[in-house]
Amino acid sequence: MDINASRALANVYDLPDDFFPKIDDLVRDAKDALEPYWKSDSIKKHVLIATHFVDLIEDFWQTTQGMHEIAESLRAVIPPTTAPVPTGYLIQHEEAEEIPLGDLFKHQEERIVSFQPDYPITARIHAHLKAYAKINEESLDRARRLLWWHYNCLLWGEANVTNYISRLRTWLSTPEKYRGRDAPTIEAITRPIQVAQGGRKTSSGTRKPRGLEPRRRKVKTTFVYGRRRSKSRERRAPSPQRAGSPLPRSSSSHHRSPSPRK
């Protein structure tokens, strides 16, 4: 990957959360962008990675939504005097990446017991589900940003998306009173290129070529008694004839020829 594209991809993680579409909208848009490539069995890098994240997000999203629904249904059977487990006792996403998946439940259970040894069983299940759902949501957020990057590279081209992320980051980091009211859009960035390409084919005007070209001598014309003569043409040798005078006769023609009538 190009170094500028790699830097832009890293900057995607710093963009605001509300910049990206919701999960449902994102997956639908990504599938629309990927469908032509799926039909042609394309093995482009962006196609393969975006397809992977579409499948991953759909599975994780459904699982996470199920966790939230079960956790909410357990609230009715948790004793009302039960205090919720503080956030500090719940495993965070960064910690979960260092813990083997099979040991995740054991580590979370130990933390709940350290908070309150006789914590109610329904409240424990609720705490587990909330912790796992939070971990999944953070993983989904990273996957969502990566999916956005890859399917937009298919739509607009990697170079255009890289340029767009750079401009957007600059706009976001500029104080509000020194920047434009509206954030840059990728459509506005790519539009001049599309207009230039189309205009080159349909333009009927003349366009000055770039670079050096031989200078052309202007052709001046003059009008002599209704006839146009180009001054650039090679001029004939001067003659004693003046404009409007009869043609001069040769010396041999000074004597009149004998008249046919006598």
Swiss-Prot record:
Residues 215-234, 252-262 have a biased composition (Basic residues). Keywords: Capsid protein, Cytoplasmic inwards viral transport, DNA-binding, Host cytoplasm, Host-virus interaction, Microtubular inwards viral transport, Phosphoprotein, RNA-binding, T=4 icosahedral capsid protein, Viral penetration into host nucleus, Virion, Virus entry into host cell. It comes from the Viruses. GO terms for molecular function: DNA binding; RNA binding; structural molecule activity. It holds the Pfam family Hepatitis_core. One of its GO terms (biological process) is symbiont entry into host cell. InterPro entries: Hepatitis_core, Viral_capsid_core_dom_sf_HBV. The keyword RNA-binding applies. Residues 254-260 are annotated as: RNA binding. GO terms for cellular component: host cell; host cell cytoplasm; T=4 icosahedral viral capsid. Disulfide bonds: none annotated. A motif (Bipartite nuclear localization signal) lies at residues 215-233. Residues 183-262 are annotated as: Disordered. Self assembles to form an icosahedral capsid. Most capsid appear to be large particles with an icosahedral symmetry of T=4 and consist of 240 copies of capsid protein, though a fraction forms smaller T=3 particles consisting of 180 capsid proteins. Entering capsid are transported along microtubules to the nucleus. Phosphorylation of the capsid is thought to induce exposure of nuclear localization signal in the C-terminal portion of the capsid protein that allows binding to the nuclear pore complex via the importin (karyopherin-) alpha and beta. Belongs to the avihepadnavirus core antigen family. Homodimerizes, then multimerizes. This is Capsid protein. It comes from Duck hepatitis B virus (isolate white Shanghai duck S31) (DHBV).
